[in-house]
Regions:
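Loop-to-transmembrane helix entry
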Residues: 7-31, 74-75, 155-156
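Multi-pass alpha-helical transporter architecture, strongest
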Residues: 154-188
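A membrane-interface helix-boundary motif in multi-pass transporters
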Residues: 132-165
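C-terminal ends and interior cores of transmembrane alpha-helices
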Residues: 56-69
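Intracellular juxtamembrane helix-capping segments at the cytosolic ends
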Residues: 89-103
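Loop-to-transmembrane helix entry/capping segments in MFS-fold secondary transporters
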Residues: 16-17, 102-115
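Helix-to-loop junctions at the C-terminal end of transmembrane segments
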Residues: 32-46, 134
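Hydrophobic core of transmembrane alpha-helices in multi-pass small-molecule transporters
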Residues: 74-89
């Protein structure tokens, strides 16, 4: 968001001048959404909760692609709001699922594997892949009157990231087999 400050059209907009407020919306959303996890898991089950998270990533990236810190700042705001669902519903719910479904004798190993696959290996592959996309589609525009270099092409990257998240969600919906049993008010 801060990089838009080099573009005269956006330099004095709310989104650029108050980017920290937008970023704080993500933190507030994450704090609130973590409280929703028990309800959503009980009501919809792990498969639907994980799909909701994956679709939230699609929307988050799509909102970034469509938004800007000027007239499209509301799309940035929506992106920040869905972050809590995207992050918490995937990471926290996934961890709770692993904890619930594994035998106590291998639970810590299963949790370690889940963390390594999502935040270790998965994050590394994701970062390298995202960098390849960025290197391909983001480019520098001629310097502005103030002498600042401005970059462009981010919209394409965000659309690619959204499409990738959508493909992952579709594959998860097809291949993840788990039958959720809705419990009554007494937890039975």
């Amino acid at each position: 968001i801060f990089s838009f400050g080099g573009i005269p059209e956006y330099a004095d907009t709310f989104g650029v001048q108050h980017a920290n407020i937008l970023i704080s919306i993500s933190q507030i959303s994450e704090t609130f959404c973590i409280l929703l996890i028990p309800f959503f898991l009980g009501r919809f089950g792990i498969k639907r909760v994980m799909l909701i998270a994956m679709l939230a990533w699609v929307f988050r990236f799509g909102f970034f692609a469509l938004g800007n810190p000027g007239s499209g700042v509301w799309l940035f705001g929506l992106s920040m709001l869905v972050y809590g669902v995207a992050f918490d519903f995937f990471n926290v719910s996934g961890s709770l699922f692993v904890d619930k479904e594994t035998d106590i004798s291998i639970r810590s190993s299963a949790q370690g594997l889940f963390m390594m696959m999502t935040n270790g290996l998965g994050a590394t592959i994701g970062t390298l892949s995202a960098q390849a996309v960025i290197n391909r589609f983001v480019y520098a525009l001629p310097e502005t009157a103030s002498g600042q270099e401005v970059i462009a092409g981010w919209n394409t990257c965000w659309y690619i990231f959204a499409a990738y998240a959508l493909v992952v969600a579709a594959l998860f919906a097809i291949f993840f087999k788990y039958k959720h049993v809705v419990k009554d008010e007494c937890g039975r």
